[in-house]
């Protein structure tokens, strides 16, 4: 998978329904690859969505995928600000998980 490690939820899906998991991963790769919008920005968009929908671990993991795709700390900082603008303080509290040190 080009975007980094496979998230735990996909690993669980792979164990229970490998064929469907492959479909999900194929679609994910197609959508998140470089195109008119560079992959790192698409990944930052997913981080914003995770912040707004209150997924702190996902936000941290996606931020690390964005870094691996070439996103700078300044870009991650601005994505956190966008999450706050559209999701309010709860999204900000979740979004700051993007600053967790990568493992």
Regions found by a protein language model. Give the residues of each.
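C-terminal structural segments of small proteins and small subunits
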Residues: 74-101
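Residues within well-ordered alpha-helical secondary structure of globular protein domains
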Residues: 26, 48, 82-85
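Acidic, glycine/proline-rich low-complexity segments that act as flexible tails and inter-domain linkers
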Residues: 1-43, 64-68, 94-103
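Generic low-complexity, intrinsically disordered sequence content enriched
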Residues: 17, 48-51, 89, 96
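Mid-chain, well-packed structural core segment of small domains
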Residues: 54-80
């Amino acid at each position: 998978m080009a975007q980094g490690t496979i998230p735990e939820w996909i690993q669980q899906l792979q164990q229970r329904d490998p064929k469907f998991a492959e479909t999900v991963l194929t679609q994910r790769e197609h959508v998140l690859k470089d195109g008119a919008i560079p992959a790192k920005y698409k990944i930052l968009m997913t981080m914003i969505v995770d912040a707004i929908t209150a997924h702190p671990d996902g936000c941290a993991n996606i931020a690390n995928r964005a870094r691996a795709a070439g996103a700078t700390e300044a870009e991650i900082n601005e994505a956190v600000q966008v999450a706050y603008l559209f999701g309010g303080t709860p999204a900000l509290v979740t979004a700051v998980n993007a600053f967790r040190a990568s493992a």
